[in-house]
Amino acid sequence: MFTLKKPLLLIVLLGIISLSLCEQERNADEDEESETKRGIFTKINKKKAKTGVFNIIKTIGKEAGMDVIRAGIDTISCKIKGEC
Protein backbone atom coordinates (compact mmCIF):
# COMPACT_ATOMS: atom_id res chain seq x y z
CA MET A 1 0.00 0.00 0.00
CA PHE A 2 2.85 2.37 0.85
CA THR A 3 4.43 1.79 -2.59
CA LEU A 4 1.26 3.07 -4.28
CA LYS A 5 1.12 6.22 -2.16
CA LYS A 6 4.49 7.58 -3.31
CA PRO A 7 3.69 7.67 -7.06
CA LEU A 8 0.21 8.98 -6.34
CA LEU A 9 1.63 11.74 -4.14
CA LEU A 10 4.19 12.57 -6.84
CA ILE A 11 1.46 12.80 -9.50
CA VAL A 12 -0.66 15.05 -7.29
CA LEU A 13 2.27 17.36 -6.53
CA LEU A 14 3.25 17.60 -10.21
CA GLY A 15 -0.36 18.33 -11.11
CA ILE A 16 -0.60 21.12 -8.55
CA ILE A 17 2.67 22.66 -9.75
CA SER A 18 1.62 22.54 -13.40
CA LEU A 19 -1.78 24.05 -12.56
CA SER A 20 -0.18 26.92 -10.68
CA LEU A 21 2.18 27.60 -13.60
CA CYS A 22 -0.73 27.55 -16.05
CA GLU A 23 -2.68 29.92 -13.83
CA GLN A 24 0.22 32.38 -13.73
CA GLU A 25 0.53 32.30 -17.52
CA ARG A 26 -3.22 32.71 -17.90
CA ASN A 27 -3.20 35.76 -15.61
CA ALA A 28 -0.35 37.29 -17.61
CA ASP A 29 -2.26 36.68 -20.86
CA GLU A 30 -5.41 38.23 -19.41
CA ASP A 31 -3.46 41.32 -18.37
CA GLU A 32 -2.05 41.69 -21.88
CA GLU A 33 -5.50 41.20 -23.43
CA SER A 34 -7.08 43.79 -21.15
CA GLU A 35 -4.41 46.33 -22.09
CA THR A 36 -4.98 45.57 -25.76
CA LYS A 37 -8.73 45.91 -25.34
CA ARG A 38 -8.30 49.25 -23.60
CA GLY A 39 -6.27 50.49 -26.54
CA ILE A 40 -8.84 49.25 -29.03
CA PHE A 41 -11.75 50.75 -27.11
CA THR A 42 -10.12 54.16 -26.90
CA LYS A 43 -9.63 54.11 -30.66
CA ILE A 44 -13.25 53.05 -31.17
CA ASN A 45 -14.51 55.72 -28.77
CA LYS A 46 -12.51 58.38 -30.61
CA LYS A 47 -14.00 57.22 -33.91
CA LYS A 48 -17.50 57.27 -32.43
CA ALA A 49 -16.95 60.77 -31.07
CA LYS A 50 -15.74 62.00 -34.46
CA THR A 51 -18.65 60.30 -36.19
CA GLY A 52 -21.08 61.82 -33.70
CA VAL A 53 -19.69 65.32 -34.24
CA PHE A 54 -19.82 64.91 -38.01
CA ASN A 55 -23.41 63.65 -37.81
CA ILE A 56 -24.43 66.68 -35.75
CA ILE A 57 -22.75 69.06 -38.19
CA LYS A 58 -24.32 67.25 -41.12
CA THR A 59 -27.80 67.43 -39.54
CA ILE A 60 -27.44 71.14 -38.78
CA GLY A 61 -26.24 71.76 -42.33
CA LYS A 62 -29.18 69.86 -43.80
CA GLU A 63 -31.68 71.77 -41.66
CA ALA A 64 -30.10 75.12 -42.53
CA GLY A 65 -30.05 74.21 -46.21
CA MET A 66 -33.69 73.14 -46.12
CA ASP A 67 -34.62 76.44 -44.43
CA VAL A 68 -32.85 78.39 -47.19
CA ILE A 69 -34.58 76.34 -49.87
CA ARG A 70 -37.99 76.83 -48.23
CA ALA A 71 -37.41 80.58 -47.96
CA GLY A 72 -36.38 80.70 -51.61
CA ILE A 73 -39.45 78.74 -52.68
CA ASP A 74 -41.69 81.02 -50.62
CA THR A 75 -40.11 84.11 -52.21
CA ILE A 76 -40.45 82.71 -55.72
CA SER A 77 -44.06 81.66 -55.18
CA CYS A 78 -44.83 85.10 -53.74
CA LYS A 79 -43.34 86.82 -56.81
CA ILE A 80 -45.15 84.47 -59.18
CA LYS A 81 -48.48 85.16 -57.50
CA GLY A 82 -47.70 88.87 -57.28
CA GLU A 83 -48.46 89.05 -53.58
CA CYS A 84 -45.09 90.49 -52.50
UniProtKB/Swiss-Prot annotation:
Q: Which InterPro entries match?
A: Antimicrobial_frog_2, Frog_antimicrobial_propeptide
Any one GO CC term of the record: extracellular region
Where does it mainly reside?
Answer: secreted
Q: Which UniProt keywords apply?
A: Amphibian defense peptide, Antibiotic, Antimicrobial, Cleavage on pair of basic residues, Disulfide bond, Secreted, Signal
According to its UniProt entry, one GO biological process term is: defense response to Gram-positive bacterium
Query: Which cysteine-cysteine pairs are annotated as disulfide bonds in the entry?
Result: C78-C84
The answer to whether keyword tRNA processing applies is no
* Proregion residues excised on maturation: 23-36
Signal sequence extent: 1-22
As annotated in Swiss-Prot or TrEMBL, what is the tissue specificity of this protein?
Expressed by the skin glands.
Segments forming a coiled coil = none
Among Pfam families, the record links this protein to: Antimicrobial_2, FSAP_sig_propep
Location in or out of the cell: Secreted
Q: Which family does it belong to?
A: Belongs to the frog skin active peptide (FSAP) family. Esculentin subfamily.
What role does this protein play?
Antimicrobial peptide.
Q: What is this protein called?
A: Esculentin-1Vb
Q: Supply the source organism for this entry.
A: Odorrana versabilis
